[in-house]
UniProtKB/Swiss-Prot annotation:
GO terms for cellular component: Cajal body; nuclear speck; nucleus; U2-type spliceosomal complex. One of its GO terms (molecular function) is ATP binding. It comes from Danio rerio (Zebrafish). PROSITE patterns: DEAD_ATP_HELICASE, HELICASE_ATP_BIND_1, HELICASE_CTER, Q_MOTIF. Residues 113-125, 169-200 have a biased composition (Acidic residues). Component of the 17S U2 SnRNP complex of the spliceosome, a large ribonucleoprotein complex that removes introns from transcribed pre-mRNAs. The 17S U2 SnRNP complex (1) directly participates in early spliceosome assembly and (2) mediates recognition of the intron branch site during pre-mRNA splicing by promoting the selection of the pre-mRNA branch-site adenosine, the nucleophile for the first step of splicing. Within the 17S U2 SnRNP complex, DDX46 plays essential roles during assembly of pre-spliceosome and proofreading of the branch site. It is an enzyme of class 3 (hydrolase). Residues 1-14, 40-87 have a biased composition (Basic residues). Residues 15-24 have a biased composition (Low complexity). Residues 1-200 are annotated as: Disordered. It is found in: Nucleus speckle; Nucleus, Cajal body. Its EC number is 3.6.4.13. The gene is ddx46. It holds the Pfam family Helicase_C. This is Probable ATP-dependent RNA helicase DDX46.
Length: 1018
């Protein structure tokens, strides 16, 4: 063991060497030499065994490394073997036997080394030759397979081209050919590249083989080659087609920002197409739904169980009880009996606790009758006075209705929808609803316009059982994100509050669009304080066998409101308002109603000057400001509010004590809602109404409201109404009642359509699009201006310069200017005497035909004859015939009519003498706007038009404001155009028309702060 170890460990060998030296120095030399020979033989055998092991290890390394690594490894091994042999030779004893053994070992090693090197080199060459043969064979197979595939691809392309002969897109065919040529060139380049660098191709194939081995698809060497060739066929086809397809996609330049910028600069955007697409996209959700194709979940409507106490009541007792509840009247079969306490309506304990917490002691008359009717699953029309608790009447049955159904899941719409006409009323109902929804774990979302839509969309996506909305914003929500925000598929309970306003002509399309998208077997409830008969017919279209509950008559002011009507002049209204505010301002909050937004802002300034802090509320204020103003008014931060009728509906302020109608309401329902803001929930209130003599037509509605509510009617109001009726009767006019809000909405009739077309034409003309192809048959702006001109054309004949026959011609035509021109004439020349005689004979013949004597000659003829005879003009006596002719001329001038006899006389006079025509035209500009009149009547404009057209233009007549007619002998302001050339008159008229048109366009598109909130179409 010790001898073997000294051949492998240096320390052991040194230790052995020192031991051998000590032995050599020993006296027993024979024994020492014998041992040394034995050791040398053992050493040589071990050296040979080690060389064989090294050869085996080198062979294993050759298989694992590349050719370059193998060469380096062999050189390193040779250097190591030499160093080891030298080291071991130094370790041997220095005697003669050891030297001989060393020489033998070296000779053996030198004989073995060439053999070992030759073996390694031959093995490497053999491996390289075999590998090269395999690569060449594989390349040949690949080349054949690729050529076959190219032929098949070409055939397919030819077949595709033949199949697309019908196409007219020659550019696409050229692109296909170019792409095919590029494809073949790319394949050739790849083949050339494979010849240049075969090692890369081989390594790729090795990777493919490894993948196939892992998948277990290759079972042998032959199978491996075949599978490899098949795989490459598929690879060739895919690698050639996929880049081609991606290249075609890349031509769209969708992800290239530079290309996108370029396209946006060069291409024109069709705004009309984009708008149409957007509107169509919005309408997709709101189109009528085919409910027969949708399978809705069943639900329960009837939850009402009549308690024994009510069941024992006889019909007579029920009638008496309804009479006690302010005279409830019920229409419809099967209406339940009215309840007496909250417990009898069948609501949960949580709702009862909420009612107790918010001091709802017992049901009001409308609640007592409406709640059991709705709980029974019936559709309802509820009519009750303002402040009677209509909101609770439809909220409590709604909670019971919702809790009976399964919870709202993800991406599902609400179960109940409450629609209101105003944003303020929507917020108020939401606030009232949240008093109960928190304890019932229900979610309420208020959807209204004027605010950001993103927050409301986020709330709807989280899910809600109840939506309180205005119709316009609800339609926007249904169309947002292709209908993914919310839907109406699970809606089973629909409430329309202030139903008469909702079914106004302006709200009806939006309301019907929403209702038609709800399932047909829904439960629909309507409430309002006023419900005209015309609106009732519209409402019944969406109701199914409704029950009508009416409390206290239709449209009646609450008896708790003390009403006063004051007939007053317009100038004294503000002072009277200050007097009323002095009495009531300290007692509570006050609302002052006006009719227009600008009047609200003006009255606000006047009150601020009078040291009354106040705020104004109208539709022109931003929604956030409106919300804050109402909150401040309800909280008592500001106790005086100036508002339009936007605040007249649904606004509930506890401490409101006074309502002042500064502008008289224009119909009965508006008065009821204004006065109904005070005197709510049994509190005392006061209502003052100012009416002027010019507003006598509204006095009948105020008189009716006072009589129906049981208030005293002032004698001045009765006298005002009586005088108005007598005046209308004397004029032969019929007095019509103006009930309802129908006059405020869009009518969607031909008049509004015509106004919209006119506004569209004005905009097109301003943008230079007046020659577009979509012009309709409506009057354009040029025809409107022409009709307002009320043009009058005349053609007058005058004698040529130097002619003496002007007197006769002027006498025939009746021209005054001819007389003024005759004053400068001298004795007629000899050449004109003959023509003068012909004119005299013609005049005598005409007089003889008409049986007229010398006394019948008109003033112009007498003056002409006197001048021709050389005498003086004597003031003529005015006969009855002359007066009649003057009256006839006035009528003819007003009607722009020329008698036939006069035309015949002018024609004969023109034939008898050489005359010069003068063309005249009158353009009436009295009815145009002031700026338009100024523009065409300025000195610079008239001078420029005269120089351009070579016509004389003068301003005549007097300006008369609208509604005032000129007196006899006067005319409205007009422009008189005179010229000897008809073309000059036409050019002057065209230039005047152009100037007026430009001014009208400017006025149409300019901002006019004085008419804020109202628009006037010229």
């Amino acid at each position: 063991m010790g001898r073997e170890s000294r051949h492998y460990r240096k320390r052991s060998s040194s230790r052995g060497r020192s031991g051998s030296l000590s032995k050599s120095r020993s006296p027993d030399s024979k024994r020492s030499k014998k041992d040394d020979r034995t050791a040398s033989r053992t050493h040589s055998r071990r050296e040979r065994s080690r060389s064989r092991e090294r050869r085996r290890s080198r062979e294993r390394k050759r298989q694992r490394r590349s050719s370059r690594d193998r060469r380096r490894s062999r050189s390193r091994e040779r250097r190591r073997s030499k160093s080891r042999s030298r080291g071991r030779s130094k370790e041997k004893p220095e005697n003669g036997d050891q030297t001989a053994d060393k020489k033998k070992i070296k000779e053996e090693k030198e004989e073995e080394k060439p053999e070992d090197q030759d073996f390694d080199q031959n093995t490497l060459e053999e491996e390289m030759r075999k590998r090269k043969e395999r690569v060449e064979k594989w390349r040949e197979e690949q080349r054949k397979t690729a050529m076959e595939n190219i032929g098949e691809i070409k055939k397919e392309l030819e077949e595709m081209k033949q199949g697309k002969k019908w196409s007219l897109e020659d550019d696409d065919e050229e692109q296909d050919k170019a792409a095919e040529a590029e494809e073949s060139e790319r394949m050739e380049e790849e083949e050339v590249g494979e010849e240049v660098d075969p090692l890369d191709a081989y390594m790729e194939e090795v990777k493919e083989e490894v993948k196939k081995f892992n998948m277990g698809t290759m079972k042998g060497a032959n199978d491996k080659k075949g599978g490899m060739s098949v795989t490459k066929v598929v690879t060739v086809v895919k690698t050639k087609k996929m880049p081609h397809a991606t290249k075609k996609k890349g031509e769209l330049m969708e992800n290239d920002q530079d290309a996108m910028e370029y396209s946006s600069e060069e291409e024109e955007v069709d705004l009309q197409t984009a708008l149409t697409g957007f509107q169509t996209k919005q309408r997709k959700v709101l189109e009528p739904v085919d409910h027969q194709k949708i399978q809705y979940e069943p639900f329960r409507k009837n939850f009402y169980v009549e308690v024994p106490e009510l069941a024992r009541m006889s019909p007579e007792e029920v009638s008496e009880y309804r009479l006690e509840l302010e005279g409830i009247s019920v229409k419809g079969k099967g209406c339940p009996k009215p309840i007496k306490t909250w417990v009898q309506c069948g609501i949960s304990m949580k709702v009862l606790n909420a009612l107790k917490k918010h001091n709802y002691e017992k049901p009001t008359p409308i609640q007592a009758q409406a709640i059991p009717a709705i709980m029974s699953g019936r559709d309802l029309i509820g009519i009750a006075k303002t402040g009677s608790g209509k909101t609770i009447a439809f909220l409590l049955p709604m909670f019971r209705h919702i809790l009976d159904q399964r919870p709202v899941g993800e991406a599902e719409g609400p179960l109940a929808v409450i629609m209101t006409p105003t944003r303020e009323l929507a917020l108020q109902i939401t606030k009232e609803c949240k008093k109960f929804s928190k304890s019932l774990a229900l979610r309420v979302v208020c959807v209204y316009g004027g605010t950001g839509i993103s927050e409301q969309i986020a709330e709807l996506k989280r899910g809600a059982e109840i939506i309180v909305c205005t119709p316009g914003r609800m339609i926007d929500m249904l169309g947002a994100n292709n209908g993914r925000v919310t839907n109406l598929r699970r809606v089973t309970y629909v409430v329309i509050d202030e139903a008469d306003r909702m079914f106004d002509m302006g709200f009806e399309p939006q309301v019907m669009r929403i209702v038609d998208n709800v399932r047909p077997d829904r439960q629909t409830v309507m409430f309002s304080a006023t419900f005209p008969r015309t609106m009732e017919a519209l409402a019944r279209r969406i109701l199914s066998k409704p029950v009508e509950v009416q409390v206290g008559g239709r449209s009646v002011v609450c008896s708790d409101v003390e009403q006063h009507v004051i007939v007053i002049e317009e100038e004294k209204k503000f002072l009277k308002l200050l007097e009323i505010l002095g009495h009531y301002q300290e007692k509570g909050s006050v609302i002052i109603f006006v009719d227009k937004q600008e009047h609200a802002d003006g009255l606000l300034k006047d009150l601020m000057k009078a040291s009354y802090p106040c705020m104004s509320l109208h539709g022109g204020i931003d929604q956030y400001d409106r919300d804050s103003i109402i909150n401040d008014f309800k909280n008592g931060a500001c106790r005086l509010l100036v508002a339009t009728s936007v605040a007249a509906r649904g606004l509930d302020v506890k401490q409101l004590i006074l309502v002042v109608n500064y502008s008289c309401p224009n119909h009965y329902e508006d008065y009821v809602h204004r006065a109904g803001r005070t005197g709510r929930a049994g509190n005392k209130g006061y209502a003052y109404t100012f009416i002027t003599e010019g507003q006598a037509r509204y006095s009948g509605d105020i008189l009716k409201a006072l009589e129906l509510s049981g208030s005293s009617v002032p004698a001045e109001l009765e006298q005002l109404w009586t005088n108005f009726k007598e005046q209308q009767k004397a004029e032969g006019k019929i007095i019509k009642s103006s009930s309802g809000f129908s006059g405020k909405g869009f009518k969607f009739d031909e008049t509004e359509h015509a106004l919209a077309n006119e506004r569209k034409k004005l905009q097109k003309w301003a943008l230079g699009l007046h020659d577009s192809d979509d012009e309709d048959t409506a009057l354009d702006i040029d025809e409107q201006i022409e009709s307002m001109f009320n043009s009058k054309k005349r053609v007058k004949d005058f004698s040529a310069p130097g002619s003496v026959s002007a007197g006769s011609a002027g006498g025939v035509s009746g021209s005054v200017s001819a007389v003024s021109g005759l004053g400068s004439l001298s004795t007629p020349s000899a050449g004109n005497i003959q023509k003068l005689e012909i004119a005299k004979k013609l005049a005598l013949r005409i007089q003889a035909q008409k049986n007229l004597g010398a006394e019948a000659q008109d003033v112009m003829q007498q003056a002409t004859n006197a001048i021709l005879r050389g005498g003086t003009i004597i003031a003529p006596s005015v006969s009855a015939k002359t007066i009649a002719e003057q009256q006839a001329e006035k009528i003819n001038a007003k009607l722009n009519y020329t008698p036939v006899e006069k035309l015949e006389e002018e024609r004969q006079a023109a034939e008898a003498a050489e005359t010069v025509k003068r063309y005249e035209e009158e353009l009436e500009i009295n009815d145009f706007p002031q700026t338009a009149r100024w523009k065409v009547t300025s000195k610079e404009a008239l001078q420029r038009i005269g120089e351009y057209s070579e016509a004389a233009i003068t301003i005549r007549g007097t300006y008369f404001p609208p509604g005032k007619e000129p007196k006899e002998g006067e005319r409205k302001i007009y422009l008189a155009i005179e010229s000897a050339n008809e073309l000059a008159v036409q050019k002057a008229k065209a230039e005047i028309t152009r100037l007026i048109k430009e001014e009208l366009i400017r006025l149409q598109n300019s901002y006019q702060p004085t008419s804020k909130g109202r628009y006037k179409v010229l």
